Design a protein with these regions (language model features):
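N-terminal subdomain of nucleotide-sugar transferases
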Residues: 1-48, 84, 223
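Donor nucleotide-sugar binding/catalytic pocket of nucleotide-sugar-dependent glycosyltransferases
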Residues: 130-131, 137-187
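Nucleotide-activated donor-binding/catalytic signature segment of Leloir-type glycosyltransferases, i.e.
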Residues: 243-261
Length: 370
């Protein structure tokens, strides 16, 4: 049985225990379903001992001692790769500073190293940090040029080629359907249970209320779409500002703001709403977008690398250049579009596809390993 290790390099909420949508765990489940073992590594700065979870057979999650500098983390040892008898590491390291060290360890011990990347340039809000990270990126690029490197989106593939890194192909991000609950009942019944007007036109926004997600654009979106109400699920640094601006604009009565919900209830809102709004013009992928589409909730999204890849414009959703265009697009969403969105995810955006592609590399290990 092959063992694939999937390390996370960034200090991020996505790896916290109890959170439902951990991409690495979704991929691990897909590997297990194909007859492999998968070990997910999450960095835990400040801890001294490893703690583990075993959510299902052949899936192991290890919370590892690590050092941290800002969002960057560094594992104190890669010995776990030998302890777990790793055949390969599935690296989603992008510009992480720990990538070169992992590569050297794998090279020394004959472990296949390959990557699935979403972005390379720093997106830090601090110019000095961006400059330093982009300067240090050359270390990662040297590794990616020597190893099979896949892109999560066509935009990333183009970026890799521009930086002199041969792209081995697209390896798309997938949805972990094992964590998605079944939501029984009609939309009318669901709305009654949620106390949402059965006849209202309602879109849902799900995401962090931070600047990178552009949540403040919900204000002009609602102003330009007077016939619509919004369910806004999320919290973040711009949460209070958003609430204030909605109030000042006289829009707060058309909104339901929810800081945090259990996963099951988030999915209930996908089934209750007429459309899903994605405002981030730099969205590299969009897991909430995939979830909404899987529920049959048609998306209206700004053009960005992720939505441009996922949505077939006019078929499984609508792509727009601006907030006014998004407002107009809301009225063009249909149930048929929602069904097409659901089919789109089922056919192209499940983790099984990525896992199957990755396993082909293990059969070519001698060819790839350098």
């Amino acid at each position: 049985m092959k063992t694939i290790v999937i390390p996370q390099f960034h200090r991020a909420p996505s790896g916290q225990r109890g959170l439902y949508n951990r991409q690495e765990v979704g991929l691990a489940r897909a590997f297990a379903a194909l007859g492999c073992r998968a070990v997910v590594l999450y960095p835990e700065p400040g801890t001294k001992t490893m703690q583990t979870e075993s959510p299902e057979p052949n899936v192991k999650i290890c919370h590892m001692p690590a050092a941290a500098i800002g969002a960057q983390t560094f594992y104190k040892s890669w010995q776990i790769l030998l302890d777990e008898h790793a055949d390969a590491v599935h690296v989603m390291g992008d510009n992480s500073l720990g990538v070169p060290g992992l590569y050297r360890f794998c090279q020394k011990h004959g472990i296949l190293f390959y990557s699935q990347l979403s972005a390379l340039k720093s997106t830090s809000g601090h110019a000095a940090v961006r400059w330093v990270m982009d300067l240090l990126l050359c270390r990662n690029l040297a590794v990616y040029r020597k190893t099979p490197t896949f892109a999560k989106t066509p935009a990333t593939a183009a970026e890799l080629e521009a930086l002199g890194v041969p792209c081995a192909g697209l390896m798309l991000v997938g949805l972990d359907t094992a964590i998605i609950p079944s939501i029984p009942g009609s939309r009318t019944a669901i709305r009654r249970a949620l106390k949402i007007d059965e006849n209202a036109k309602v879109f849902v926004f799900v995401g962090r209320l931070d600047a990178c997600k552009q949540p403040l654009d919900l204000v002009p979106l609602l102003q330009a779409a007077p016939g619509w109400c919004a369910v806004i699920i999320g919290q973040g640094t711009q949460g209070e500002t958003l609430k204030t601006r909605l109030t000042e604009a006289g829009l707060i009565g058309r909104c339901r703001l929810i800081d945090r919900l259990p996963n099951e209830q988030v999915h209930i809102y996908y089934h209750a709403c007429d459309a899903f709004a994605n405002l981030n013009e730099n969205e590299t992928f969009g897991m909430s977008l995939l979830e909404a589409m899987y529920a049959g909730c048609p998306p209206v999204a700004r053009h960005a690398p992720g939505p441009d890849l996922i949505i077939e414009d006019g078929v499984s959703g609508l792509l727009c250049d601006s907030v006014p265009a998004m407002a107009a697009a809301l009225d063009k969403t249909t149930r048929t579009m929602g069904h097409a969105a659901q089919s789109r995810v089922n056919e192209h955006f499940l983790w099984q596809n990525s896992a199957e592609l990755a396993l082909t590399l293990l059969n070519q290990k001698k060819t790839w390993h350098k």
